[in-house]
Amino acid sequence: MNADELKQTIPEKAPVIKEQIETEFRTASGITDGKNKIFGVVIITAGYEADGKYTHFFKTDVKLKVGSLSLAGGEYIFGYQRLDAENLRVTFYKAKDGELVGALKAQVERKKGAIYSLLIEPPTAKKGKIYIGRFTFEYVLEN
């Protein structure tokens, strides 16, 4: 998605459990096929009851598989914990009520290049990558 599309799509405040939490637009990333969208953005959790559980708001209009997790179209929040120098545990929750969806492992990306707070790459043959800093995990568009 280009900057104008992101501005029209990313909410200033994301609906997270019983709160409306401010988003950090400069960290937003998303993709679209012109009809459906997948996007994510860092949320500013200071002063909320996040307890470090979540740091990002994520919305998909289509069914996805992220790592081994299946996500229906909808709104999610996720956070991560560093397991070691090579891996993060990324945990997804439903944004509406904080219900745990599950966790996956993100691994260090070895390719050189820019590092983003969040980057959702467009898919090739229905597969793409989501980057959190220099860590990455795969997603697959499901029909």
Which ranges hold each PLM region?
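Primarily secretory-pathway and cell-envelope proteins
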Residues: 1-49, 98-143
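Mid-length scaffold segments of soluble, non-membrane domains
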Residues: 46-97
